[in-house]
């Protein structure tokens, strides 16, 4: 499968056409960003780690019946995915209080939630990806009510699969962000990536942060903690 025309370049990935009209090539970059792009840095090896981790996690999800756009890992920094139209909603699943939730509801970071919370954010960099409700989604016509219901159910199902996968390697899944898209038949599929860029991951014993908070909060070497996650998940 050969890399064709550049379709889109985001903060962390580039998207290219291939000779197959419904298959695209994703290339992971070494760029690290935080605070809606206000903090930026190039970190050698980050793209390789995120590609490997995402490929591994999507394979594990598919093995547990979770459909996604993922086809296969193509190289160290590239993977093939099914073409989807991204739904402009960022879906956040929270198991433990951290980040913006701690500020918003006044609970201490690290407080377990009695059940997972699913939140929706409008995927719009210029607006700062604001928190939205299902009513906003309806008014803005971002997705149908059936799609929102499917996204909600899929997000919880993904959480149910991922939590024990991480727990088995002594990592706590604090929260994570998902994106979904519509395929050529209109089916809603998990898309984008699942990596330490999009998850909060803590060592279950030491509470060491093993995710992009290391970059956000200047807590250490990003590639070192991403390598820990890859290794614990059984990757190389």
UniProtKB/Swiss-Prot annotation:
Keyword Nucleotide-binding part of the UniProt annotation: yes
Gene3D superfamilies: ATP-grasp fold, B domain, Phosphorylase Kinase, domain 1
Listed InterPro entries: SAICAR_synt/ADE2_N (IPR028923), SAICAR_synt_PurC (IPR033934), SAICAR_synth (IPR001636), SAICAR_synthetase (IPR050089), SAICAR_synthetase_CS (IPR018236)
CDD domains attached to this UniProt entry: SAICAR_synt_PurC (cd01415)
Pfam annotation, one family: SAICAR_synt
Family per similarity comment: Belongs to the SAICAR synthetase family.
Protein name as it appears in the record: Phosphoribosylaminoimidazole-succinocarboxamide synthase
Species annotation: Lysinibacillus sphaericus (strain C3-41)
